[in-house]
């Protein structure tokens, strides 16, 4: 990349940053915000006795999110990857999929971003927010000083980094497909030098002993999960999500249109589009506490680069 291209990219990033700041101020004034207006599952059109695919195995936070959202009105299918869960819905093998979306400490779950971008016939119909309490666990009889290797999902490793530096600075880490997969691995290994960081319930499920609780950086740790369907939602909720595929210097025009439509930009995640440098796929989430209207959606989807992924309400579980 030459100096001219680098300057253009820096300028574009500056424009986006300034635009987001302006939007934040605007939404505080206009009344669109993250408090209130949250729909419950009762307000959504959920299929009875649904088949729900989720990022497994049993004992993951994704399973907890799925059970919280659907209750007893569903059968649950654990899958090894986010992509497998999404493909179940696309192929008609499941009515819904539940996947992790974003964590307050670890940021966006990259697999979720890539999975949504890759599918044209998948929609977001709900969101679940869970409090996350990461727990260190090992086989019975394990002491902290025994541990040489800590296994977890990438998010669990990132969220516990500060605690591990203080209490087991010499222990290595190994990423697993999920926190529950890490707990299962430790149970099968039967090795006191290996521990897992997972949800508290995974310890009981896999016969492990809890060595330390709340090893995440902060008690404010939360993860958001998407509920996906192959059916486009008929009703609009308080939130909506879009995919924008464009060059970096065009995304600010879309952000301004979101502002003009009276919507709050909640999050924006980007991934390289893959065809040439400077082109990206963006996941854009918007919100308005009074509910999003069809007119607002049409205003945003007027761009040829925009693909609508759904409008939905949010359920949050509290400790």
Language model features: what each stretch is:
Residues 1-12:
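N-terminal secretory signal peptides that target proteins for export/translocation
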Residues 14-319:
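Domain-level signature for soluble enzymes in the chorismate/prephenate branch of the shikimate pathway
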């Amino acid at each position: 990349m030459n100096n001219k291209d680098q300057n253009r990219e820096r300028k574009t990033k500056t424009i986006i940053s300034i635009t987001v700041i302006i939007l934040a101020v605007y939404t505080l004034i206009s009344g669109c915000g993250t408090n209130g207006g949250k729909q419950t599952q009762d307000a959504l059109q959920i299929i009875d006795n649904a088949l729900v695919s989720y990022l497994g195995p049993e004992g993951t936070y994704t399973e907890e999110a799925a059970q919280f959202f659907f209750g007893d009105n569903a059968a649950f299918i654990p899958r090894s990857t986010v992509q497998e869960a999404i493909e179940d819905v696309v192929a008609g093998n499941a009515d819904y999929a539940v996947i992790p979306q974003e964590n307050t400490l670890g940021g966006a779950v990259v697999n979720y971003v890539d999975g949504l971008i890759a599918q044209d016939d998948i929609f977001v119909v709900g969101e679940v927010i869970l409090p996350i309490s990461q727990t260190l666990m090992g086989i019975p009889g394990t002491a902290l000083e025994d541990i040489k290797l800590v296994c977890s999902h990438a998010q669990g490793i990132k969220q516990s980094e500060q605690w591990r530096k203080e209490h087991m600075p010499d222990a290595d880490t190994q990423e697993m497909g999920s926190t529950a997969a890490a707990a299962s691995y430790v149970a099968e290994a039967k090795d006191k030098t290996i521990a897992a960081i997972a949800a508290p319930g995974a310890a009981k499920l896999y016969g492990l002993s809890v060595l330390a609780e709340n090893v995440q950086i902060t008690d404010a740790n939360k993860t958001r999960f998407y509920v996906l369907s192959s059916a486009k939602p008929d009703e609009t909720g308080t939130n909506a999500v879009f995919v924008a595929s464009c060059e970096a210097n065009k995304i600010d025009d879309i952000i301004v249109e979101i502002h003009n439509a009276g919507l709050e930009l909640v999050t924006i995640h980007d991934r390289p589009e893959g065809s040439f440098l400077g082109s990206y796929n963006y996941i854009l989430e918007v919100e308005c506490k009074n509910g999003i209207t069809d007119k607002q959606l049409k205003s945003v989807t007027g761009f040829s680069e925009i693909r609508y992924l759904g409008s939905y309400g949010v359920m949050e579980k509290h400790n």
